[in-house]
């Protein structure tokens, strides 16, 4: 049972980290690369499957969309955040590729 709890805690932390990446992705945040690297390292070391990352992304985008609608704003700009997901998955592929050739 504790392994399941640990997994849930890890997933919540990853979701929180990914939220920070999303919020700063289109800004000039100089720490963004470090945030992405930290996230990728955590995902890689924990052996989190790619569909889980996609699910985290979709959940957060859905939350953002609901918030924008509550504020009376459109959510068209959220489509741009697909780039964030593509970037994260590309970094993860590089981590896997690097691990294979070591």
Curated annotation (Swiss-Prot):
Instruction: List, alphabetically, the SUPFAM superfamilies matched.
Output: KaiA/RbsU domain
Enumerate the InterPro entries for this protein: Circadian_clock_KaiA (IPR011648), Circadian_clock_protein_KaiA_C (IPR020856), KaiA/RbsU_helical_domain_sf (IPR017944)
Enumerate the spans annotated as KaiA C-terminal domain: 1-102
Protein's UniProt keywords contain ATP-binding? no
Q: Per its UniProt record, what Pfam families does this chain match? A: KaiA (PF07688)
* UniProtKB keywords: Biological rhythms
PROSITE patterns cross-referenced by the UniProt entry: KAIA_C
Superkingdom, natural source: Bacteria
Misc note: Lacks the N-terminal pseudoreceiver domain (PsR) domain found in some cyanobacteria (also called KaiA N-terminal domain).
State the family it belongs to.
Belongs to the KaiA family.
Oligomeric form and interacting partners: Homodimer. The KaiABC complex composition changes during the circadian cycle to control KaiC phosphorylation. Complexes KaiC(6), KaiA(2-4):KaiC(6), KaiB(6):KaiC(6) and KaiC(6):KaiB(6):KaiA(12) are among the most important forms, many form cooperatively. KaiA and CikA bind to the same region of the KaiB(fs) form and therefore compete.
Name this protein carries in UniProt: Circadian clock oscillator protein KaiA
Species source reads Nostoc sp. (strain PCC 7120 / SAG 25.82 / UTEX 2576)
